[in-house]
Design a protein with these regions (language model features):
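N-terminal, positively charged/glycine-rich alpha-helical extensions of SAM-dependent methyltransferases
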Residues: 1-26
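A short acidic, Gly/Pro-enriched loop at the edge of an enzyme's catalytic core
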Residues: 112-121
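Residues lining the SAM
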Residues: 123-125, 154
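A short glycine-rich, Lys/Arg-flanked "PGG" loop and its adjoining helix->strand segment in the class I
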Residues: 135-150
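Conserved class I S-adenosyl-L-methionine
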Residues: 150-189
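Short alpha-helix
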Residues: 199-206
């Protein structure tokens, strides 16, 4: 599993550099720097009032959403395993005039690395598919929350995630549960934002 994590880290380090340029506008970084809220409508609606709440953003990547939480009044910490992503996150915070704490590490290290406890853990879009054990993930989150603290999770339904589009039809392709010792391997030349940059580290494991 360590090998899979390192393979993924190299891929996400490279993606972070590409995403920091945001050539396609997929991450809305220019709009975010200009003061706009870059959260999706579903998150913005469901989160409610978070002013003054201590929030831990898990797998925060380049920190855009972490900073959106700060803009909404939260005291936010972003946690991610990619050093390149966090370099971008800190730079984006400086550019935006927003204060957030960014910590490099894995979720199971959160209680040791982050300044908890927290009122809310926040995790959205394409996160849990990368995790080898959701029980460990849940225990790590519980360990950093105050009594009565909450987890906000927004992601695609697992029933959708097992599908692939083939000949304009969605077909079941993957097992609903992937064995930890046999992660799925994928290879993509480019990242998901539409930027045409060809990546060196193209392989990921989920």
């Amino acid at each position: 599993m360590t090998d899979a994590i390192e393979i993924n880290r190299r891929n996400w380090d490279e993606r972070a550099i590409i995403h920091s340029r945001d050539t396609t506008g997929d991450y809305m970084l220019d709009r975010m720097r200009a003061g706009e809220d870059a959260l999706h409508a579903i998150e913005a609606t469901e989160l409610g009032e978070i002013g003054g709440k201590r929030v831990l953003h898990l797998q925060c990547h380049i920190g855009r959403d972490t900073l959106c939480l700060v803009r909404r009044g939260a005291i936010a910490t972003g946690l991610d395993f990619s050093g390149e992503a966090l370099r971008t996150a800190r730079h984006l915070a400086q550019e935006s005039g927003l204060k957030a704490n960014f910590v490099q590490g894995r979720i199971e290290e959160a209680s040791r690395l982050t300044p908890g406890p927290f009122d809310l853990a926040f995790s959205t879009w394409g996160t849990i598919c990368w995790l080898p054990d959701l029980r460990v993930w849940a225990q790590a989150i519980a360990a950093v929350l105050v009594p009565g603290g909450e987890l906000y999770l927004a992601d695609a339904h697992p029933g959708f995630q097992v599908m692939e589009l083939r000949d304009d039809r969605l077909e079941p392709t993957y097992d609903f549960q992937t064995p930890v010792e046999r992660p799925l391997e994928f290879s993509d030349e480019t990242t998901y934002t539409g930027d045409p940059t060809i990546m060196t580290h193209q392989t990921t494991r989920e």
